[in-house]
Every structure is written in structure tokens, then in C-alpha cells.
Amino acid sequence: MYSLIKSLATFATLFSLTLAKFESSTPPVEVVGNKFYFSNNGSQFLIRGIAYQQDAAGSVSSGYDADPNRKYNDPLADADACKRDVKYFKESNTNTLRVYAIDPDKDHEECMKIFSDAGIYIVADLSEPTVSINRNNPEWNLDLYKRYTKVIDKMQEYSNVLGFFAGNEVTNNRSNTDASAFVKAAIRDMKKYIKESDYRQIPVGYSSNDDEEIRVAIADYFSCGSLDDRADFFGINMYEWCGKSTFETSGYKDRTEEIKNLTIPAFFSEYGCNANRPRLFQEIGTLYSDKMTDVWSGGIVYMYFEEANKYGLVSVDGNSVKTLSDYNNYKSEMNKISPSLAHTSTLSSSDASKTLQCPGTAASTWKAATNLPPTPDESYCDCISKSLECVVADDVDKEDYGDLFGQVCGYIDCSAISADGSKGEYGVASFCSDKDRLSYVLNQYYLDQDKKSSACDFKGSASINSKASASGSCKAVSGVATGKASSSGGSSKSGSSSASASGSSSSSTSSGSSSSSGVKATQQMSMVKLVSIITIVTAFVGGMSVVF
């Protein structure tokens, strides 16, 4: 029975739960089946949320602080603002705030306490504007892993952290579904990190857009497979109900029917169409009615602050808050709701372990592999880096990496440093830093050219590493050294790579012939992969702002 499962789970996590701050006012919320529940009494938790962040896309509003290096504003690090705004959240019956970018180097204690005292939970995105999974050239690498775990380390101590988003609208149409494999790998690894760190079991999920061609497949994809790999919850940024509408005519009925069999909680990670202002928010009564609460776990209205996009509930000027008509309508509707709530006492033991079969990739609209990218392993990358005989010179600017990748990958097969989320194939060094990956392929070319000194030069951009060590002991925790990664279920081609962990080349060559310049003819990388690698590096070093 579920009561036995819950008792065992409670015992297993008792130590970590006792360390959570503010538990008396905001007991931890847990996931069981397709709903959230309060851990202390088993009552269903429905999200009554507001998106809470200014300048989430990366610009800095004047007056927030004078730090020129700040890339975004972390609202949970501004205690004065939290004190200013909490009354408006309480008055509008709010129990959840979504924050899109956390600064893990800032202090969040005071804001988290303010919101906990008000019964408010936080669901936070793990990325930030310049460190996120890029839908056009997706990676799951060490920089992202470090960023994500750093946010978790900072926020895990608070009982009113409801969960973490590992991505927001990364895949947004049929052309970039492969990016979802990288987000799902991030979810898998963050769940594992939380568990291995002995933190309480904080849910990790994904926030999707509402694209009609992929919305069913993407929901199934993130909720399918093993319990270790799948998302703990699934959010949809939903803007279908505009002005005066109904459950049937808005599309809500169809969306509810489409995901009614989802085995994890689903909710509106954003909602609030602004085609007509002031917004009436008549959808709130339906969202929290019996028509939807068995399938949906509430929603997060977009957004608190009035900005250029005209989605705000209030206008803020310094410490002055002016409520808009949108806020008044929202507040009125939120204070009318009286939803029926489920309870864990009605669940069976199977509810906690149900899962879905992953969507196939035969259809043209869905191509994300179930074989996921490997876990980024810093010690493995360091080991490989130390073993390379030819490396990129330390004085080479990162801005020049793209040209070097383009040059060397025109000579050899660079699949060892590339990743393909549609085929489920991930190179042995695909998650390492740009510098390590560039050194890897420079070394591969150097070995392929029989260690000719001229093959490790590239006009002074490469140099011989006289301290190179044997690489036979380089082993990745995830098993990536053999080209393997995890599979979240279903059938997909197993990940593989043509290069060994030592960086030696195994690309095919012609029958001993060489070009007039003395360069062996080797298997060249496909133009698609080559352009992809160059674009990734260019975006990285150029500080490209991507969707997060």
C-alpha cells in the first residue's frame, strides 16, 4: 500500500528533511503519481503562482545595482523588494513564485524566509541567460553541469523550494526536437546529484511551449522511461485562453484530454494571454475546477512586473508599487477559487511508479533519441587533457577557436567531440570544455600525421605537450569512454564514437597516399557537424544570449 511506501521513503529521507529550513511554515512538497502533495499531511498541492523576475532575458534595469558585470537580476537576492512585494502575493492568494535565473553567489536567506512565512514556494530555473542549453546547437557539458549543481547547492536547504526547471522552451518546434535529449540528460543528472548529495528529494522538471505539432510527443518524452531518467514534473507555457472564452472553446478541454494519462504532475508554467487588456483571467475558475485539477496541478501567471511586453500585474518604480487592472482582476479571480483536493490516502502503491513508453522517432515531427548524452565528467576530461601530446596553445584567444575547429575538422573526423541528439550518438569528449575538445582534435590530427612536428603547429596555435601522460587510466563515471550513455526507454541507436579515450585517431585513411602538402587524406567530418561545432564555439565565446 502507498502508506508503507511513504513510511519507507520518509524514513530514508528523514535526515535530509530535518535540515530543511522553514519547514514549519512551508513543509516540503513531494511528487506522487501525477500530483504534488504536502509531505506533512498528504493533501494535494495546487500551484497558485506568479512569474517573479525583472529583466529575466539578461538586461539590467536601472537602479537595481551598479554592478556592470551582472547579467540578470535575481529577485531572491533583493530583500527590500521581497518585503515590498510579499503583501501583493498574499492578497492574491499566491503560493508559488517562478524565478528564471538564480545567482548562486548571492544570499537568499532573507527572501526565502519572507516568502516561507507567507506560505510561498519557489520553483526556479537552473540556467541563466548565457549559460543554458541552446536549442540550435544543444550540448550538455561541464559548464552547464557546474552551473546547475551550483544553483541546487545554494537552494536545496530551503523547504519552500518546490522544484527546479532544467530547461524552458529549449525545443520549440519540429526542427529542434533533438535538443530535448540534452535537457532530459540534465534532468537525469540533477536528480542523481540531489540523491547522491543526500539532499531532500527536490523535483526536477521541464517547461515547454505549446506547439501543436510536438506538444503531445514532448510531454510523453519527458515523462517516459525509467524513474531515474524521466522528469519529475512537466510545465506548459499556455496562452490559449484569451479574453472571454470557455473550457471547450479555449482549447483547454483538448489539452486536458491530450495529457490525461501523463504519469507526472503537469501544470501551466506560464499562462495569461494579453491579446486583450486588461486581462480578465476568467480561465482561473476553470483551471482550478474539477474539470482540470485531476490532470493539472494549477499554474503560474505571467508575470508580476510590467515591462515592455505588457504582461505585468503591477508597475514598480523604486519602492513604489502600483497595481494594474490586470492585478485587480487576477486577485479577484484567485480569491474565488475553492478547488477539490486529492489525498495520498487514496493512492495505491503502483501510482508512485507508473511510467510511459517513449514516443518513437519515425514521425517527422519528433526526432529526440531515447539514448541520452552522458554525464559530464570533469575528472575524465582532465585526465584526457593531460594525456594529449598536441594541444591548443595557451595564448590562443577563445574567439579564434571556431576557425581552428573549422580547419582541423576539415582534415579529420571530429565525431569524438560532437553530439547528436537525434541519433543518440555522443563523442567521448563531447561534454568537455571547448579548450579540451579543441586540443583533443588537434592531437587526433597530430597522431594521424605520424607525429610530424609540422602537424602540431597551426601557425603557432598548437604546441607539443612534453608532459603528456598515458591515458589508459582515463575512465568516465558514466561509461562514456566506450561511447555509452543512458537510455530512457524505447529503442534508439546506441551512442558510439570512432575515437578512443587517448585521442588517437581511428578515422579511415586512403591507401597510404597523401596530398601535395604532406597531409594524409583522412575521413572528413560532415559539413553539418562541422558547422554545428563552429557555431557552438562561436556562440560560447561571443556570449550569445539564448533561450533559458
From Swiss-Prot:
- UniProt key word NADP: no
Residues anchoring lipid (GPI-anchor amidated serine): 517
Q: Which GO terms describe its biological process?
A: adhesion of symbiont to host; biological process involved in interaction with host; cell-substrate adhesion; cellular response to alkaline pH; cellular response to calcium ion; cellular response to pH; development of symbiont in host; filamentous growth
Subcellular location, record wording: Cell membrane
Glycosylation sites noted in the Swiss-Prot or TrEMBL record: 41, 173, 261
Please give the Gene Ontology molecular function terms for this protein. Answer: 1,3-beta-glucanosyltransferase activity; glucanosyltransferase activity
- List all disulphide bridges recorded for this chain: 82-111, 224-358, 242-273, 381-432, 390-456, 409-414
Membrane topology for this entry? Lipid-anchor; GPI-anchor
State the signal peptide span.
Answer: 1-20
Q: What is its main location?
A: membrane
Source organism, top-level taxon: Eukaryota
Cellular component aspect of the GO annotation: cell septum; cell surface; cellular bud membrane; cellular bud scar; extracellular region; extracellular vesicle; fungal-type cell wall; hyphal cell wall
Region annotation (Disordered) maps to 483-518
Query: Which UniProt key words apply to this protein?
Result: Cell membrane, Disulfide bond, Glycoprotein, GPI-anchor, Lipoprotein, Membrane, Signal
What SMART domains does the database record attribute to this sequence? Answer: X8
* Propeptide positions: 518-548
**What upregulates or represses it?**
Strongly expressed under conditions of alkaline pH but not expressed at any pH below 5.5.
Q: What does this protein do?
A: Required for apical cell growth and plays an essential role in morphogenesis. May be integral to the pathogenic ability of the organism.
What family does this chain come from, according to its entry? Belongs to the glycosyl hydrolase 72 family.
Q: Report the protein name in the record.
A: pH-responsive protein 1
Q: Which organism is it from?
A: Candida albicans (strain SC5314 / ATCC MYA-2876)
